[in-house]
Design a protein with these regions (language model features):
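Sec-dependent N-terminal signal peptides
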Residues: 4-16
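Cyclophilin-like peptidyl-prolyl cis-trans isomerases
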Residues: 17-207
Length: 207
């Protein structure tokens, strides 16, 4: 029995190891500087796949950082957060892809810590092109958190590894309420093509 368990465990390890992939890194080049982000396809495959589709197909062309959420500009929210939000801004934008499966932090284990990148959404399963980056730890955005009344949290899928100073510059840029004035242009989002294609070709979600 013990040998059988060891054999079974070995098979499980081999199967799971065959389906792991190196974490790709993308660079968000903005007017304020560059932000490097490591993505976690092994933990959040649907969300990373979606984001990299936008990158590989140049669907983020014309994207901006347009929203800054600070402690002093959310007077009507009992649960306050600090993030910057970017993307195409329009859910009906011609470059937008269909909404994706909502991967909760309970599923992925990726918490909303300082520098975490995550998907903006309305209802669960409506995220598409809009994303945000956390300034400081934001546990209220995790599964079970109270920022969104449905308690499903937001789909985190990576973390800033270089350029948090740029994130903070954007966060403190001039704004009217939560809306950056002017918006901060995203000049390009790119990564090593072989890394991106490895995810897109070998990690296509089935859900």
């Amino acid at each position: 029995m013990k040998k059988a368990l060891i054999f079974f465990g070995t098979i499980v390890w081999l199967l799971t190891s065959c389906h792991t992939i190196d974490n790709p890194v993308v660079t968000i080049k903005t007017e304020k500087g560059d932000i490097e982000i490591e993505l976690y396809p092994n933990k959040a495959p649907y969300t990373v796949y979606n984001f990299l589709k936008y990158v590989e197909e140049n669907r983020f062309e014309g994207a901006t950082f347009y929203r800054t959420v600070r402690i002093d500009n959310q007077p009507n929210n009992d649960v306050k957060i600090e993030v910057i939000q970017g993307g195409l801004y329009d859910d009906n934008h011609p470059q937008a892809l269909s909404p994706i499966h909502h991967e909760t932090t309970k599923e992925t284990g990726i918490k909303h810590l300082d520098g975490t990148i995550s998907m903006a959404r309305n209802e669960p399963g409506t995220a598409s092109s809009e994303f945000f980056i956390c300034i400081g730890d934001q546990p209220s955005l995790d599964y079970g958190g109270k920022r969104n009344p449905d308690g499903q949290g937001f789909a985190a899928f990576g973390r800033v590894i270089k350029g948090m100073d740029v994130v903070k510059k954007i966060h403190q840029s001039p704004a009217e309420g939560q809306w950056l004035k002017p918006k901060i242009k995203i000049l390009k989002i790119s990564g090593k093509r072989e890394q991106l294609l490895k995810v897109l070709e070998n990690w296509a979600p089935q859900k």
